[in-house]
A protein has these predicted regions:
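Intrinsic-disorder/coil detector with helix-boundary
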Residues: 2-370, 379-399
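Short glycine/proline- and acidic residue-enriched helix-loop micro-motifs
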Residues: 374
């Protein structure tokens, strides 16, 4: 049985840096203590356990200031501290994301000076202050070459110049992956997604409030709710294996998360996980309900509720702030492009609230939803992400 524990995230890689530090969602999340568990050693099938595979041309712990000269089959994009800790727990049986662990990875700094002028919020992030876009780490899953990339740039926090986009394009051009996976926490859209469930999809939509002068197509895509698509055939053999054998390992942690809310007023809609969370795959076993199997990526923090107050329910099944931006970046590359997938876990479900009284302002409505959802995210973000990490392994193992 996994042991329940609590860990404290290090200062870097805050998910709510810059203008989002005072958002109602962030304030609620930051008041909570994130529940974590210590996973048992995982028995991987068919010799498919992840194993480190250092770059041949770079010493572990070195800073890569020029182009990466080695290629991979899969590039996995990671965003927040708790998200990478959960994936590391699954992939390496060691969730630590300490300064020492970061120094054992490879700092990615190619062309930092070129892009520095368009990066806002450098002083809010230790890695950016050190001239690093993020950290990369190579490993193998069977015969599949994988590179993990923990980005310190985020679409929602580093300004309307969107430095995240050219850096992703540069990294993809150097590594030449066949598949890019963007993964981590998300909010559930619709009533069928519960905490810990995972959605794997090759479709995304942008949902933006800001204008991006350098990327006017983003404004148009968002305004028209245009679907970004590619065609990825997921061999679900090991995804199904993960759903059958691995997602149940998150249940002790999810039970502890639920206990944090069992007696809180206003959270009766939150359901206790009575069975292993589901992994839904677009085109294989879609999420029940009318919502399209899309990831909806906003440049602000969004929440679905039973009144569809933010109009998300016609757009997708999960909402985040990253994936569609990454996929837009990939789609704009010339020549051969990699396929891409969003693999997201629900860290908070649809919020269920009574009808708001007449005269309630839109801001009051959204802040109420964010306060409820942000608290759930704050508690559940680690334990739910274990399941998207299992799903990532399943997709990679099936290649």
């Amino acid at each position: 049985m996994p042991a329940i524990s609590h860990i404290t995230a290090p200062a870097p890689s805050r998910p709510f840096a810059g203008p989002f530090a005072n958002d109602a969602f962030a304030i609620a999340a930051n008041k909570e203590t994130t529940v974590t568990i210590d996973l048992p050693t995982i028995s991987w099938p068919d010799g498919l356990g992840p194993t480190p595979k250092p770059f041949a041309d770079h010493a572990p712990g070195s800073v890569i200031s020029g182009p990466l000269s080695e290629q991979c089959d899969v590039l996995v994009l990671l965003y927040t501290t708790f998200e990478i800790q959960a994936l590391l727990d699954v992939f390496t049986n060691n969730p630590a994301w300490t300064a020492a662990r970061q120094k054992s990875w490879y700092g990615y700094a190619h062309n930092f000076d070129k892009f520095k002028s368009i990066i806002q919020g450098i002083d809010d992030d230790t890695a950016l202050k050190d001239g690093l876009f993020g950290y990369v780490f190579p490993l193998m899953v069977g015969e599949t070459r994988v590179v993990l990339y923990k980005t310190e740039l985020h679409p929602k926090t580093n300004g309307t110049g969107l430095p995240f986009i050219p850096v992703i394009q540069q990294l993809v051009s150097e590594l030449q992956p066949k598949l890019v996976i963007s993964t981590g926490t998300a909010g559930g859209i619709g009533s069928h997604i519960q905490c810990g469930d995972v959605v794997i999809t090759d479709a995304a939509r942008l949902h933006c409030k800001l204008n991006y002068p350098k990327y006017p197509a983003i404004d148009t895509l968002s305004k028209n709710n245009t679907q970004l698509t590619n065609t990825v055939t997921v061999n679900d053999k090991y995804v199904a294996y993960a759903a059958q054998n691995f997602t149940k390992l998150s249940l002790p942690g999810l039970a502890k998360c639920y206990a944090e809310f069992a007696t809180r007023q206003g959270y009766s809609f939150l359901k206790k996980n009575s069975s292993a969370p589901s992994i839904y795959v677009k085109g294989v076993n879609p999420v029940p309900g009318p919502q399209p199997m899309d990831i909806v990526s906003a440049d602000y923090l969004t929440v679905d509720d039973n009144n569809n107050s933010e109009g998300l329910q016609s757009l997708g099944t999960m909402n985040d702030t990253d994936d569609a931006f990454a996929f837009y970046a990939i789609n704009q590359l010339s020549g051969t492009k990699p396929n891409w997938l969003s693999i997201r876990n629900a860290s908070e479900p649809q919020v269920d609230v009574p009808k708001f009284p007449p005269g309630t302002s839109p801001t009051q409505v959204v802040d109420k939803l964010k306060t409820l959802a942000g608290a759930i995210y704050g508690v559940y973000q680690y334990c739910t992400t274990l399941n998207s990490a299992f799903a990532c392994w399943g997709v990679i193992a099936g290649m």
